[in-house]
C-alpha cells in the first residue's frame, strides 16, 4: 500500500517547505524506500512556462517535458530521482482538465462543483504520481500558506485522502515560522498556534510540526507547541538556519524525523545510511580553493531565475575541491567599454538561457571577450545561440548576423525558428521540451567531458535552432559542431577546440546535475576555470 505524506505551510510563505519535503524524501530513500514527490501550486496559470522569471524564478523542465516549479529541482537534486508531469499540479491545470471533461459530456449532465469534481481530480493527480513511478511513498507539498483562499480545494483533497486510503497510510506535516522577537528576548508560538487552528478548522490535524527558527527553540517551546497543537513533543521538529542546504537532511535525521514518520505510517524499514551524504556535506564545508565565475544574465536581480545553474556550478566545484565565487553580471551593463572591468578577473564565464532581446548584445560582448582572451566559457540555450551569432559577426564577418527571434529582418539568420514551430501560435507548453538524445563528435572537448560516450540524453527548452544553411561556412572557419541530434538535423553543442574551454549547449545540462553526481559538461567547465585560475 502506498503511503502518502502531505506537507503544508503556515504563517508565511517561502518558509522552506520544499527543502523539508526534499530532505525527508532523501532520508526515506536511504531507508530503502522508493520515493516520489510532487508540488501543488494554487495559482491559475496552467504551468510556470509563460511566467516572468521575476515572478516565479526558473522554470524547471522534467524528462517528459513538463514545465514546472523550481522546487522540483530541489526534489530531484536532494533525492536523486527523475520526476514527471504529475509532479507539479496547478489550479489552472486542474480546472482546465475538469472543464474540458465537462464540455465533452463526461460528467453525464451533473452540476460540476469544487466538491467532488475538483477535489477528485486533485486526488487522481496524487495517486497518478505514485502509480506512474511505482513508489512506496509519495510526498506532496502544497504551495502557499494555510488560510490562502486559493489553497482551499487542495487542502480539502488532502483531508479526504485520509478517509480514502486509511489513517495509517496518511501523514500530515505542517511547517511554520517560529519568530524570535529580539526586543522581548523570546520566541513567539502564537503564530504557529493560530496556523494549526486554521488547519484543524479545515479538518486536518497535523501529525508533525516543523518549525523554522534562527536559533534552537528548546524543549520548553516544543512542549508548549505540542500541547496547544495536539502533536507529540518528539514530533515537533526544528529546521534551523544552516550554512549549506545539504546539511538539512542530517539535522532532521538527528531529531528522528524519518523514524517518527516511519512509525506513524507503520513502515518497518532499516535506518537510513547517510554516511555518503555526510561525507559530501563535510567536503562541501571544507573546500580548499575558490574559483571566480562570472554569470552574465538578464535576470540577475533575482538569483532564483538561475537556481539550477548555480547549483550545478556548486556541484562541479565540489569535485574540484573549490568553492564558487559567483559574480552576477547584468548583461545590459556589458559593453565594449565596460567588458574588461566587469569580466577581467573572472576565471570562467557562463552565459545562461533566456528569452527576448533585452541584454543579448551584452551577452554577445561577454562571449566575444571570452573567445578573444581565452577565458573558459560555457553557454547554455540562448547562450549557445548567441555564441553562434558572435562567431558569425566577428570571425565570419557576417555583419548584422543575428537570431531570427531577435531580428526577424536580419540578412544572416544564423539562428532560426525550428520547422515544427513555424505555425504554432500559443506560447505555453509549445517549445521543444524534455529529454532528447545528443550524438557527440569523437575527439571533441564535449565528448571528452562525457567520457567519450557516443550519445547523451539531456533536457531541452527552446523554440529556435542553429540554421544549417550556415553550417559549412562555420565548419570551414574552425567552428566545431560537437553535438548534434541523431539525424544530424539539429545542432546541440558547439565549441572551439583551440581554446581552454569554449563550449555552448542548446540543452540545459544543469537540470541533471546532482550534489553527489555533478553534470559532466559543467564539471569540465569548472575544471578548466580552476586551471585558468592557477595559471594567473
UniProtKB/Swiss-Prot annotation:
One GO CC annotation: cytosol
EC number annotated for this UniProt entry: 6.3.4.2
Binding positions (CTP): 13, 148-150, 188-193, 224
Listed transmembrane segments: none
UniProt-annotated binding residues for L-glutamine: 54, 354, 382-385, 405, 463
Gene Ontology MF terms in the entry: ATP binding; CTP synthase activity; glutaminase activity; identical protein binding; metal ion binding
InterPro entries given in the database record: Class_I_gatase-like, CTP_synthase, CTP_synthase_N, GATASE, GATase1_CTP_Synthase, P-loop_NTPase
Disulfide bridge positions per record: none
Pathway: Pyrimidine metabolism; CTP biosynthesis via de novo pathway; CTP from UDP: step 2/2
Chain positions recorded as Mg(2+) binding sites: 71, 141
Means of activity regulation: Allosterically activated by GTP, when glutamine is the substrate; GTP has no effect on the reaction when ammonia is the substrate. The allosteric effector GTP functions by stabilizing the protein conformation that binds the tetrahedral intermediate(s) formed during glutamine hydrolysis. Inhibited by the product CTP, via allosteric rather than competitive inhibition.
Residue ranges constituting the Glutamine amidotransferase type-1 domain according to the UniProt record: 292-535
Segments for region (Amidoligase domain): 1-267
One GO BP: pyrimidine nucleobase biosynthetic process
Keyword vocabulary terms for this entry: ATP-binding, Glutamine amidotransferase, Ligase, Magnesium, Metal-binding, Nucleotide-binding, Pyrimidine biosynthesis
Residues involved in ATP binding: 14-19, 71
Recorded catalytic activity of this chain's protein: UTP + L-glutamine + ATP + H2O = CTP + L-glutamate + ADP + phosphate + 2 H(+); L-glutamine + H2O = L-glutamate + NH4(+); UTP + NH4(+) + ATP = CTP + ADP + phosphate + 2 H(+)
Annotated binding of UTP, by residue: 13, 188-193, 224
Catalytic residue list: 381, 508, 510
Quaternary structure, from the entry: Homotetramer.
Function: Catalyzes the ATP-dependent amination of UTP to CTP with either L-glutamine or ammonia as the source of nitrogen. Regulates intracellular CTP levels through interactions with the four ribonucleotide triphosphates.
General remark: CTPSs have evolved a hybrid strategy for distinguishing between UTP and CTP. The overlapping regions of the product feedback inhibitory and substrate sites recognize a common feature in both compounds, the triphosphate moiety. To differentiate isosteric substrate and product pyrimidine rings, an additional pocket far from the expected kinase/ligase catalytic site, specifically recognizes the cytosine and ribose portions of the product inhibitor.
Family: Belongs to the CTP synthase family.
Name used for this protein in its record: CTP synthase
Record organism: Streptococcus mutans serotype c (strain ATCC 700610 / UA159)
Gene this protein is translated from: pyrG
